[in-house]
Regions:
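Acidic-basic catalytic patches of nuclease active cores, encompassing PD-(D/E)XK
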Residues: 1-16, 62-67, 75-81, 88-168, ...
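Nucleic-acid nuclease catalytic cores
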Residues: 50-89, 219-252
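Surface-exposed cleft-lining segments at the edges of enzyme active sites
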Residues: 24-26, 153-160, 194-209
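Charged phosphate-binding loop/patch that engages nucleotide di/tri-phosphates or the phosphate backbone
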Residues: 272-319
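Polybasic, proline/glycine-rich intrinsically disordered low-complexity segments
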Residues: 244-288
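A short acidic, glycine-rich active-site loop
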Residues: 45-57, 202-219
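Short, well-structured alpha-helical interface segments that form or flank functional binding sites
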Residues: 2, 165-170, 212-223
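Conserved catalytic cores of phosphodiester-cleaving nucleases, focusing on short active-site segments
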Residues: 3-59, 170-199
């Protein structure tokens, strides 16, 4: 199953990942009553949420024990009660917080490694929801109504209270049981207006030494990919569904200098959605997930001379 991960943060000093899943409910006080009555809170809570969140909450407890996992349950515009589930060793430990108390904890954890350069949360998109990803989830789960979820972005901004975020979201995340492999999908919206999805690439705006450099995002994704020992797919798309979508499987990356090697694929929007639907229910034993598609390998020699070679990036794929 495929779903988004709301927030992941890696601490260099602790060598540890912190994961946050935000679930907005209609009545937080009814959940508080379940806690007080010592009923089967976890089972009853899962019944009250949508299928995408249920799938996430089924997988999160099974992730590596070195990941500190938090489920934050809140009600919009209610600040006197937030329920946080700390998950470890297969146990769900609930704690009650006020918004202020949770914000103090959240900001302290966000700054655990001290001051580092990082883009502010929400800079990439002006609204809180990622409509492209939500539309994909609507198709994958065959929902009657369009899926709507801001992945906790609004409450995260409030919790940080202006601090620069050290965390990031994973647009789509998957564990494939037949291959025992994790997949990370990151969607990169092409808003340049002058470069096609096929020629778009993070090296055009990362590892540039400019103020708007976005390398931290890709370093964080690369660390997560290595931690999970999985695959990382970067998907370049635009608002024009008639334009081909570009997928880059990141094979190797240097935190200091950028991309070292990748395999690149291109396909139409409709074929991309069909491929994702196949991935959503993948049961094959091999992990050649894109074996049906033509690809081009860009190696260390290509990326070592990126300034000169970028004009040739994407050649061989037709717009």
């Amino acid at each position: 199953m495929i779903f988004p991960i709301d927030r992941v943060q890696y601490s260099i000093t602790k060598n540890k990942f912190y994961l946050f899943e935000f679930v907005m409910v209609e009545n937080i006080y009814s959940l508080e009553q379940m806690l007080q009555q010592k009923t089967n809170f976890w089972a009853n809570f899962k019944k009250s949420i949508d299928i995408v969140h249920r799938n996430k909450l089924d997988l999160i407890p099974k992730l590596n024990n070195n990941i500190a996992k938090h489920i934050i349950i809140y009600q919009k515009d209610v600040d006197d009660l937030i329920i946080v589930l700390f998950i470890g060793q297969g146990k769900y430990i609930p704690h009650k917080y006020t918004f202020k108390k949770l914000s103090n904890y959240f900001r302290k954890l966000n700054g655990i490694d001290g001051i580092t350069s990082s883009k502010g949360l929400g800079v990439v998109r002006s609204d809180n929801e990622d409509n492209f990803v939500n539309a994909i989830l609507t198709e994958l789960y065959e929902l009657d109504d369009k899926y709507s979820d801001d992945c906790g972005l609004e409450i995260t901004k409030r919790l940080l209270d202006g601090d620069e975020t050290k965390g990031f979201d994973i647009d789509l995340f998957q564990y494939i049981s037949s291959t025992r492999e994790y997949i990370l999908y990151e969607f990169l919206k092409n808003e340049t207006g002058y470069i096609s999805n096929i020629k778009a690439h993070p090296m055009r705006y990362s590892w540039t030494n400019r103020k708007d450099d976005n390398k931290r995002k890709f370093i964080s994704l690369w660390r997560a990919k290595r931690y999970f020992e999985g695959k990382l797919y970067l998907i370049n798309y635009s608002n024009d569904k008639n334009e081909k979508i570009s997928i880059s499987e990141v094979i190797d990356l240097s935190e200091a200098n950028g991309f070292i090697e990748e395999n690149k694929y291109c396909m139409s929007y409709n074929i991309f959605i069909a491929w994702l639907k196949d991935m959503h229910k993948y049961t094959k034993k091999h992990n050649y997930y894109l074996s049906d598609f033509r690809h081009k390998n860009y190696d260390k020699d290509f990326f070592a001379h990126w300034k000169a070679s970028k004009k040739d990036y994407g050649k061989g794929f037709y717009d």
